[in-house]
């Protein structure tokens, strides 16, 4: 009964106005009141402030400063192995697996199409058909900066307007096409593993979605799809990000979806539905074929292998305040079909 009421409220409440109000309040400098709100939030959600670069809640001028707090250097070591991709965010792995018949799993008995998620961009959808997907939900207590699973060169960013349903297990089980209906920012990268999409999904009271190259992408919410293209590697103005480097952040909430092209990638064997994720830990890797042992002639002297490279620390770059990369080309809905219902 209570769950039914919560779902009905998702349809009835003025979600955009609630989100604007939350964003306004989260950016206000209110001195002791701000500290009180942060302290209550920390207590309610059991936030581990010992991981934060600034563990003292009095050091944050606004709630948003606290919400996107950076972590202490080295607190999230990045797996250094070249054949591995790393988890892009702290959270919970709500769903992951193969993209089958162009569909992704949202929850038990619920799926949605790749084209709907990508706002009808059939050319981009073709890049990931028969590939892999993973959905990570960031809870209120989590670190809310997003990082790169591997080295990548940004080629395209698309802002897709949409609804602002809350994103959690209850709504995933009850709101059809949830991730394809909500506001989102699609980031497409060239990587050594093939095309990679990292999709930042908005939700109720997510005041803004930001990237390190463009600053605030939303708001404003103008109700139209926007598309930016970027130079390829080696060209002037190319946006090149390293494995583990920050690429974006949420103020507040929500969910990140990764799409991987069909190929030799497989998810790390230890992952399961509802696994806790930590930025920098193993996420996926190149499938290793069994190899025939190499037999050396008798008397051959072999040098010892070099010591394993220690994990490298993740990096966080400040988000630009002045908007989009001047090198980016802004255009219309090239390659798009109308939004799927």
Swiss-Prot record:
A GO term for molecular function: phosphatidylserine decarboxylase activity
Physiological role: Catalyzes the formation of phosphatidylethanolamine (PtdEtn) from phosphatidylserine (PtdSer).
Q: Name one Pfam family in it.
A: PS_Dcarbxylase
Gene Ontology cellular component terms for the protein in this record:
plasma membrane
Q: What does the UniProt entry say about where the protein is found?
A: Cell membrane
Q: How is it modified after translation?
A: Is synthesized initially as an inactive proenzyme. Formation of the active enzyme involves a self-maturation process in which the active site pyruvoyl group is generated from an internal serine residue via an autocatalytic post-translational modification. Two non-identical subunits are generated from the proenzyme in this reaction, and the pyruvate is formed at the N-terminus of the alpha chain, which is derived from the carboxyl end of the proenzyme.
Describe how the cofactor binds: Binds 1 pyruvoyl group covalently per subunit.
Task: Show the active-site residues.
Answer: 90 (charge relay system), 147 (charge relay system), 254 (charge relay system), 254 (schiff-base intermediate with substrate)
**Pathway where this protein functions:** Phospholipid metabolism; phosphatidylethanolamine biosynthesis; phosphatidylethanolamine from CDP-diacylglycerol: step 2/2
Site description Cleavage (non-hydrolytic), residues in chain:
253-254
Q: Which gene encodes it?
A: psd
The membrane topology noted for this protein in its Swiss-Prot or TrEMBL record is: Peripheral membrane protein
What's this protein's name?
Phosphatidylserine decarboxylase proenzyme
Q: Which residues cross the membrane?
A: none
Q: How does it assemble?
A: Heterodimer of a large membrane-associated beta subunit and a small pyruvoyl-containing alpha subunit.
Which reaction(s) does the protein catalyse, per the Swiss-Prot or TrEMBL entry? a 1,2-diacyl-sn-glycero-3-phospho-L-serine + H(+) = a 1,2-diacyl-sn-glycero-3-phosphoethanolamine + CO2
Major location category of this protein = membrane
Annotated family: Belongs to the phosphatidylserine decarboxylase family. PSD-B subfamily. Prokaryotic type I sub-subfamily.
Where, per the database record, does this protein carry Pyruvic acid (Ser)?
Answer: 254
The enzyme's main class, written as a single word, is lyase
Recorded hits in NCBIfam families, A to Z, give: PS_decarb
State its Enzyme Commission number(s): 4.1.1.65
Please list where the region (Disordered) is annotated.
287-341
């Amino acid at each position: 009964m209570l769950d039914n009421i919560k779902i009905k409220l998702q349809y009835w409440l003025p979600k955009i106005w609630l989100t604007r109000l939350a964003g306004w309040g989260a950016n206000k400098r209110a001195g002791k009141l701000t500290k009180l709100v942060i302290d209550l939030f920390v207590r309610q959600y059991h936030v581990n402030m010992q991981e934060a670069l600034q563990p003292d809640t009095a050091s944050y001028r606004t709630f948003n400063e606290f919400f996107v707090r950076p972590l202490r250097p080295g607190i999230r070591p990045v797996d250094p192995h070249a054949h591995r991709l790393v988890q892009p965010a702290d959270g919970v792995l709500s769903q992951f697996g193969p993209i089958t018949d162009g569909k992704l799993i949202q929850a038990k008995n619920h799926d949605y199409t790749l084209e709907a998620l990508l706002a009808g961009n059939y050319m981009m959808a073709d890049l990931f058909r028969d590939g892999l997907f993973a959905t990570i939900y960031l809870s209120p207590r989590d670190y809310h900066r997003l990082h790169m699973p591997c080295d990548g060169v940004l080629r395209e960013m698309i802002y897709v307007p949409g609804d602002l349903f809350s994103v959690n297990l209850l709504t995933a089980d009850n709101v059809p096409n949830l991730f394809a209906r909500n506001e989102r920012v699609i980031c497409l990268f060239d990587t050594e593993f093939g095309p990679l999409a990292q999709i930042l999904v908005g939700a109720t009271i997510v005041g803004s979605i930001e990237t390190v190259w463009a600053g605030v992408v939303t708001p404003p919410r103008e109700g139209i799809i926007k598309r930016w293209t970027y130079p390829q590697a080696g060209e002037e103005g190319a946006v090149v990000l390293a494995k583990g480097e920050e690429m974006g952040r949420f103020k507040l909430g929500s969910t990140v979806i990764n799409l991987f092209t069909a190929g030799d990638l497989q998810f790390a064997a230890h992952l399961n539905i509802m696994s806790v994720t930590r930025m920098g830990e193993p996420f996926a890797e190149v499938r290793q074929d069994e190899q025939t042992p190499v037999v050396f002639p008798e008397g051959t002297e072999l040098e010892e292998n070099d010591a394993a490279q220690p994990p490298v620390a993740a990096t966080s770059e400040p988000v630009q305040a002045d908007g989009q990369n001047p090198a980016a080309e802004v255009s219309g809905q090239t390659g798009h079909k109308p939004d799927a219902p």
